[in-house]
Structures are given as structure tokens and as C-alpha cells.
Amino acid sequence: MPKKKPTPIQLNPAPDGSAVNGTSSAETNLEALQKKLEELELDEQQRKRLEAFLTQKQKVGELKDDDFEKISELGAGNGGVVFKVSHKPSGLVMARKLIHLEIKPAIRNQIIRELQVLHECNSPYIVGFYGAFYSDGEISICMEHMDGGSLDQVLKKAGRIPEQILGKVSIAVIKGLTYLREKHKIMHRDVKPSNILVNSRGEIKLCDFGVSGQLIDSMANSFVGTRSYMSPERLQGTHYSVQSDIWSMGLSLVEMAVGRYPIPPPDAKELELMFGCQVEGDAAETPPRPRTPGRPLSSYGMDSRPPMAIFELLDYIVNEPPPKLPSAVFSLEFQDFVNKCLIKNPAERADLKQLMVHAFIKRSDAEEVDFAGWLCSTIGLNQPSTPTHAAGV
């Protein structure tokens, strides 16, 4: 794909000269920020939206608990609850994640310090960050509000997400992961549908990435539920890298394409129920497992087999063949893209650069897809959105 010429970024200091959430010398910070942003390959629309967000952010100042008014709950997970809030001094609508942690003040201060790196994460593919602070036993992380919610919520309403839409999602996730790796030397560590946020302007952004090692350690006990997206090498406790994020992306894409978490794989009967036609050659070859006595009969999606215990699931990811897309329903390019993400050996798995030039990504990039229109009609949103009163279009 031809490289876009960087467009100059125009950022104006806040009228009162106030710093960005408690940092000093706003003018110097803005100059450094302007330089970094000009290195990004932004189109005109992305540039204007990022400018609008950063200009508004300058007016926010230091964040305090008393300055927020709760509007509604957006979701819960990863040891925290996320609320849609109004920041009264600026009038901005934000998403505020509250994480309750019983920790010593020194650890708490280290987490807040480590989270400050998020101020430097400015990309069209990363959720905007307003600031973090501690109050009454809880760490607050204040972010841009994305009115379409997360892709796991969208999936519940859509049933399945079309391949063309997932093409645009794949591009955004690859670009977001590439930005984090190249500009900040960090990996995400928790790629899954609930950490991919969307809005009615058609933007797709990553959130909840592992910028604070201390926060990850402090929340280690709450990460059990996310292990189902972890790569085999990570589950085995060996060294892992951004290749692990690529596995998680591949698994997430299969889940969103078929409409349920893909382990264990759907059998022929379930595939027929899912797609309304006989899908040959992709049925699960695993025989039905006997149900462990006393275990509840809940299930993933339409799967009539007994649910897996967490240890069975992790064992399956490590020792059984990886999931794949049913061949009769999806394009060869999409199938191959997912297969390259889900190679069990991380050294053989495709890397970000290889994926960016894959035929599926090239095709998806060239396709005209009204992502915003699809999202709004699927979840019942008005279009276009103004997630904050300052959103530039």
C-alpha cells in the first residue's frame, strides 16, 4: 500500500495555558506531541479527529473524583467496572474504569506513574486517554467514550459479524498493535473482542493494553477469565512476545465470524444450525465428552455438548489443533489469514508486517465498507455520532 504523506498537526495551547492533566510546560509538551503525531501516517479525517481530542484534553486539567457525574454503567471485566460519566468542569463525556485494589500506597503510586505512558499513546487505533488517579481504594482510568461499545457486545446483537466488517476490524487491530510495538515498545497482552471498541463514526480502537506491569501483577488473580484467548506458549509459561497478541486476534476473529467462542470446534450439526446449510469437512472430530459429575449444563452458544472446565479448555488450546473457519462459508483469503494467526509455534506464526501485506488485508483495505452504517443499524445507534461535544468530523 502506498505510504500517505504525513499531514501537519495543528494543536493550540489551552487559552489559560493549563497543562495536560497535571504535567508542566504545556507549550513544550505540545511541540513534542506535534512532532510525534506528524510521524504517523494519518489521513485528513484521522488528523482532524485526533486534533479535536487533544485540544479538548488540554482543557481537562487535573482529574478529581468530585468532578464526575455518573451517567450509566458500560460494562464490567478485568477486575473493574466501566461507567459512562460526565466530567463537569469540561462538559466532556468520558468512560471511567474503576479498579478496586487492596494495595500499599507505594504500589498504588507506581501504578499511577506507569499509567502516565498512556498520555503518549495517540493513534486513531488506540482509545484516547484523559488521565488516571486514585481515590477511596480505587484506581480510576479515564478514557474516550466509544458509543458503539465493545465488539463482544456488538456480537451479542449481531449474532455473527460479516467477513467484510471483520476485514476492517483486522486492519485496525494490526495497525494498533504495530503502533504500540513500534512507538512504545509495548505489547497488548489482552486482545479479545471486549477490548476492541467501536463508535458510530466508524472508528475501531484497542483498549486495556498492558502498559502497567505493576497493575498486571496486582490484578493477576482476576485474569483467569481471559486465559481462553491466550496463546499456547503463554499458557505454557514460556517466553512470549507480540506473536502472542496475533494468536489472540486470530481466535477473536474466528469467534466473531462464527458467532461463538470456537473451542471446542462446532460439530457438523451445530455448523448447519449456525449457517443454515451443510458445511462439509469442518466438523469437530473430537467425540462428545462425558460431563463431569456435578458440573452445570451451561454451554457456549448452540453447542449441545457439556461445557469445558477451565483446565480442559487450556489443555485443549495447548495440545489440540487450532480452530479454523468453516471453508464453505468464508473466502480463502480470510481462512488463510486466520490460519496464519493461529499457528501454534510462535516462530512460524505470521508477524505484524507479514499480516499487513496479506491478501485478505489488501482486499479489505481496498473495499468500500460502511462500517459506521452497519454498526448503527445493528445496535440501534444514531449516525453520525458526537461521542463528546468536541468531536471533529
From Swiss-Prot:
On modification after translation, the UniProt record reads: Phosphorylation at Ser-218 and Ser-222 by MAP kinase kinase kinases (RAF or MEKK1) positively regulates the kinase activity. Also phosphorylated at Thr-292 by MAPK1/ERK2 and at Ser-298 by PAK. MAPK1/ERK2 phosphorylation of Thr-292 occurs in response to cellular adhesion and leads to inhibition of Ser-298 phosphorylation by PAK. Autophosphorylated at Ser-218 and Ser-222, autophosphosphorylation is promoted by NEK10 following UV irradiation.
Instruction: State the disulfide connectivity.
Output: none
UniProt cross-references to Pfam families, sorted A to Z: Pkinase
A single GO molecular function term of this UniProt record: protein serine/threonine kinase activity
- Please state the protein's primary subcellular location: cytoplasm
| GO cellular component terms attached to this protein's record | centrosome; early endosome; focal adhesion; late endosome; membrane; mitochondrion; nucleus
Provide the alphabetized UniProt keywords: ATP-binding, Cytoplasm, Cytoskeleton, Kinase, Membrane, Nucleotide-binding, Nucleus, Phosphoprotein, Serine/threonine-protein kinase, Transferase, Tyrosine-protein kinase
Kindly state the subunit structure of this protein. Answer: Found in a complex with at least BRAF, HRAS, MAP2K1, MAPK3/ERK1 and RGS14. Forms a heterodimer with MAP2K2/MEK2. Forms heterodimers with KSR2 which further dimerize to form tetramers. Interacts with KSR1 or KSR2 and BRAF; the interaction with KSR1 or KSR2 mediates KSR1-BRAF or KSR2-BRAF dimerization. Interacts with ARBB2, LAMTOR3, MAPK1/ERK2 and RAF1. Interacts with MAPK1/ERK2. Interacts with MORG1. Interacts with PPARG. Interacts with SGK1. Interacts with BIRC6/bruce. Interacts with KAT7; the interaction promotes KAT7 phosphorylation.
Q: Which parts of the sequence are annotated with region: Disordered?
A: 1-27
Modified residue Phosphoserine is at which positions?
A: S218, S222, S298
Q: Give compartment(s).
A: Cytoplasm, Cytoskeleton, Microtubule organizing center, Centrosome; Cytoplasm, Cytoskeleton, Microtubule organizing center, Spindle pole body; Cytoplasm; Nucleus
Q: Where does ATP bind?
A: L74, G75, A76, G77, N78, G79, G80, V81, V82, K97
Region (RAF1-binding), start-end ranges: 270-307
UniProt-listed InterPro entries? Kinase-like_dom_sf (IPR011009), MAP_kinase_kinase (IPR050915), Prot_kinase_dom (IPR000719), Protein_kinase_ATP_BS (IPR017441), Ser/Thr_kinase_AS (IPR008271)
Provide the domain comment. The proline-rich region localized between residues 270 and 307 is important for the binding to RAF1 and activation of MAP2K1/MEK1.
Q: EC class of this enzyme?
A: transferase
Instruction: Identify residues that carry Phosphothreonine.
Output: T286, T292
Q: How is its activity regulated?
A: Ras proteins such as HRAS mediate the activation of RAF proteins such as RAF1 or BRAF which in turn activate extracellular signal-regulated kinases (ERK) through MAPK (mitogen-activated protein kinases) and ERK kinases MAP2K1/MEK1 and MAP2K2/MEK2. Activation occurs through phosphorylation of Ser-218 and Ser-222. MAP2K1/MEK1 binds KSR1 or KSR2 releasing the inhibitory intramolecular interaction between KSR1 or KSR2 protein kinase and N-terminal domains. This allows KSR1 or KSR2 dimerization with BRAF leading to BRAF activation and phosphorylation of MAP2K1.
User: Which EC number(s) does UniProt give?
Assistant: 2.7.12.2
Q: Which residues form the active site?
A: D190 (proton acceptor)
State the family it belongs to: Belongs to the protein kinase superfamily. STE Ser/Thr protein kinase family. MAP kinase kinase subfamily.
Recorded source organism is Oryctolagus cuniculus (Rabbit)
| Protein name (record) | Dual specificity mitogen-activated protein kinase kinase 1
Q: List the taxonomic lineage.
A: Eukaryota, Metazoa, Chordata, Craniata, Vertebrata
Query: CDD domains under this entry?
Result: PKc_MEK1 (cd06650)
